[in-house]
Amino acid sequence: MTSHPRSLALAAAAAFALAGCGQQAAKPAEAPAETPAAPAAAPAPVAVAPAVDQAALKGLLSPDETLEVLTLDATGAASASGEVKGYKTTVYAVPVAQGQTLSVAFEPSNTNLYMNVVDAADTSGAAAHRGEVDGPKASIAAAKAGVYLIKPFQPRATARRGESGTFKLAVAVK
């Protein structure tokens, strides 16, 4: 649409006259703007736990250790019970996604049983939780996705004598 020069001149003169007497020209009425619909909230990212490579994990175990992969229920919890007899024990594998926290409660039948929690990807052999020092409860925040091994054990002196004890584990990944 083109504007006629005379119409523009009249509009400018009217605005100038109103400005001179301290008034402003009325703005043309605008159609009420519709409020845009809020964008749908993005779904929270789902933490994806890594797959458990049992063959690779078995390579990290001693001949006296057997591997069991814990299956978490819908709430992210699992429990297990077992026995340590001498050096023989079951090692429990738990996959944990980046940003999740692995919580483990170890309940031994005697004071000579402990558990360590080890990041399977850590080749240094250092435990993320040392039961003898840190106690029977572990809480580990995963900086990256990985598999953690829960390793019940007894000290060498009692293991060499072939002593045994039972335990219960309560595991949660949140």
Q: Whereabouts are the PLM-identified features?
A:
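Sec-dependent bacterial lipoprotein signal peptides
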Residues: M1-A19
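Bacterial signal peptide processing site
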Residues: C21-Q24
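Juxtamembrane proline-rich low-complexity "stalk" or linker regions positioned immediately after a signal peptide
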Residues: A26-A56
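C-terminal edge strands of extracellular/lumenal beta-sandwich accessory domains
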Residues: A44-L70, Y92, Y148-K151, P155-K174
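N-terminal secretory signal peptides
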Residues: A51-A97, T101-A105
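Acidic, Ser/Thr/Pro-rich low-complexity intrinsically disordered segments
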Residues: V84-T90, V94-A145, K151-F153
